[in-house]
Amino acid sequence: MFRGASSLSLDDKGRFAVPTKYRDDLLSEDQGTVICTVALNEPCLWLYPLAQWQEIESRLAKISNMNPRARRMQRMLLGNATEYQLDKNGRILLAPSLRAHADLGKKIMLVGLMNKFEIWDEARWHQQMRQDTELERLGDFEPHPDLDNFTL
């Protein structure tokens, strides 16, 4: 289970070092194999441990590609999915096409969201956090039945 946000740097080759607190889990669970793809509706990337990604692939395979929305999801998620192996220093090299999708600069955020990570450009992440906080403060959001009885 991944949680928390880490500020990281991309080197000149587009690599970043996975923080140690996550690295050990990734290495023990899937020998350091991860899948990175584009997020469907935000300017960031999704990074999954291999086992988590295989579950998603299985679910995507079960939906009909005759439905335009399903086909778009399959095309975006599977067509951009790139497999990586953490190197001996715990780094991941992000493909230029993935970096371009998320408009990643030198500073990035690796955000743990339980079964996956999001990878954001750091400035854009902070902007998104301000927007999300303001929307919640104003109560300007769609009702959702799963959240009706959710308390913190």
From Swiss-Prot:
One of its GO terms (biological process) is negative regulation of DNA-templated transcription initiation. Its main location: cytoplasm. Residues 5-52, 81-124 form the SpoVT-AbrB domain. Keywords: Cytoplasm, DNA-binding, Repeat, Transcription, Transcription regulation. The keyword Transcription regulation applies. It is found in: Cytoplasm, Nucleoid. PROSITE patterns: SPOVT_ABRB (PS51740). Coiled coil: none annotated. One of its GO terms (molecular function) is DNA-binding transcription factor activity. Belongs to the MraZ family. HAMAP family: MraZ. NCBIfam families: division/cell wall cluster transcriptional repressor MraZ. Forms oligomers. PANTHER family: TRANSCRIPTIONAL REGULATOR MRAZ (PTHR34701:SF1). This is Transcriptional regulator MraZ. It comes from Pseudoalteromonas translucida (strain TAC 125). The lineage of its organism: Bacteria, Pseudomonadati, Pseudomonadota, Gammaproteobacteria, Alteromonadales.
